[in-house]
């Protein structure tokens, strides 16, 4: 029996890696051989059979030499390293750290445990990588784009923190719980991204606002609402709504200008303007009306409406009828002032009629009336101017007192008109009547005829005086 068989060295074999990491059946074989030997050593009646003792000793040596724990541990580490190399969700730093932990393991159990942890880490890293790799898709999604800045920043911060965690080259993160917390932070931030719902709400609010815009036509509202519903972002919705409100203001201005047409038509600036300017204004109004009535395709271009508004305002500002009325009044009054046959009261009265005119046609009418009155007054004045010759004529001197008084009265009435100082006669017919009366009275004077008749009667009577000689008769 060798003293080596039961030495403490054999007892310590079970604490060595070669035993600890050996296959279980080999561990069992060694332990059984060692225990069998101990039974002989501990016998009260010692076994004296040398052959039996040598067999048990040889069994211990054989089973000890058969222990392959070191080799098994080496293979386990190699296999673990190979598996870790296939864990493609881990970073290089994580793989190297995991392999370091495996290689520093003292037992196959530790190796298996570290490998299991590496695999679990790989799983959570896959989730984390997927979330990180989905960043671009997320930030380009409606869910993110249409969210408020705080929620967007929370997501971006969660991703950035995860990227820092992932990209550690020194002391890489191997704690599964820490990785899971980063995953939870990202998922929580994603769940708080409600951009799509907010886009839907923004569209609903915008459509309601557009429908309440009183300046737009129904067709314009329909198109603006379609533009809202076609929008991909809240910013686009806001832009459409802003443009709709701006268009509404322009359309309201256009409506006011078109609706004010009758008011403009009732102003002196319009009805005293020339046809060209009035037609330009009316055409501009008609063009503006087509955008309101929808005869044009629904116009959404604010600049087009603004241009139409500008055309109307320009045409309106080019209406200077009131100024032209005043100009015509001034010209008419100058002409009236030069009508030399009217008396001063007549001129003043005619000027008052001109100044009281509301239209240029009235001014022209009063001027023509003044000219006609002036012609009538000329004829009256010319007839009155004959009075000296008339009164010195035989027709007047030798006519009857009745005819003389008739002429004198007609003459006086004519002179009364010429010499008026108040309440002027503006009725041309009345003047023509006085002229006719004076003419008739003048034509009625037949004094020369009466004188001739008287002479003839006297001669006849003288010729009857037989007592007179011829010389006396002559």
Where are these regions (language model features)?
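Short, small-residue-biased leader/transition segments that mark boundaries at the very start
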Residues: 1-7
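Extended, solvent-exposed, polar/acidic, compositionally biased regions
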Residues: 74-75, 127-132, 255-258, 327, ...
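Functional cation/ligand-contacting sites centered on basic and imidazole/sulfhydryl donors
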Residues: 251, 377
């Amino acid at each position: 029996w060798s003293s080596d068989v039961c030495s403490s060295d054999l007892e310590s074999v079970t604490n060595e890696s070669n035993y600890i990491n050996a296959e279980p059946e080999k561990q069992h074989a060694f332990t059984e051989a060692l225990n069998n030997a101990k039974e002989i050593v501990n016998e009260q009646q010692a076994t004296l059979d040398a052959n039996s003792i040598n067999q048990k000793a040889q069994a211990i040596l054989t089973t000890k030499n058969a222990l392959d724990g070191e080799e098994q541990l080496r293979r386990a580490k190699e296999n673990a390293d190979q598996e870790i190399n296939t864990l493609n969700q881990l970073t290089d730093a994580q793989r190297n750290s995991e392999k370091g932990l495996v290689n520093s393991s003292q037992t196959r159990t530790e190796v298996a445990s570290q490998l299991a942890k590496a695999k679990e880490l790989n799983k959570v890293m896959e989730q984390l990588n997927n979330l990180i790799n989905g960043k671009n898709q997320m930030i380009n999604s409606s869910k993110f784009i249409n969210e408020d800045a705080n929620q967007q920043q929370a997501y971006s911060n969660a991703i950035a923190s995860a990227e820092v965690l992932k990209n550690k080259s020194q002391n890489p993160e191997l704690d599964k719980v820490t990785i899971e917390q980063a995953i939870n932070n990202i998922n929580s931030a994603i769940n708080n991204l409600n951009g799509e719902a907010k886009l839907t709400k923004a569209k609903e609010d915008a459509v309601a606002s557009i429908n309440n815009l009183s300046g737009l036509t129904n067709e314009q509202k329909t198109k603006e609402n379609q533009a809202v519903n076609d929008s991909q972002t809240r910013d686009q919705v806001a832009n459409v709504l802003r443009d709709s409100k701006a268009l509404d203001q322009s359309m309201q201005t256009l409506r006011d200008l078109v609706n004010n047409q009758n008011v403009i038509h009732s102003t002196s600036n319009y009805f005293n303007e020339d046809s060209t300017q009035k037609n330009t204004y009316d055409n501009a109004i008609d063009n503006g009306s087509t955008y309101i009535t929808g005869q044009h395709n629904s116009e959404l271009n604010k600049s087009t409406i603004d241009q139409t508004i500008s055309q109307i305002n320009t045409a309106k500002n080019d209406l200077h009828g009131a100024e032209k009325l005043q100009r015509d009044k001034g010209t008419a009054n100058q002409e009236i002032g030069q009508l030399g046959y009217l008396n001063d009261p007549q001129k003043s009265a005619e000027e008052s009629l001109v100044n009281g005119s509301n239209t240029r046609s009235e001014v022209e009418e009063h001027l023509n009336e003044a000219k006609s009155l002036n012609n009538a007054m000329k004829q009256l004045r010319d007839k009155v101017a004959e009075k000296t010759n008339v009164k010195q004529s035989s027709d007047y001197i030798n006519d009857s007192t009745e005819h003389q008084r008739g002429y004198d009265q007609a003459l006086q009435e004519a002179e009364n008109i010429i010499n008026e100082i108040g309440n002027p006669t503006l009725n041309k017919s009345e003047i023509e009547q006085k002229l006719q009366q004076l003419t008739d009275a003048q034509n009625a004077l037949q004094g020369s005829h009466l004188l001739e008749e008287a002479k003839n009667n006297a001669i006849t009577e003288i010729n009857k005086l037989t007592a007179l000689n011829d010389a006396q008769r002559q």
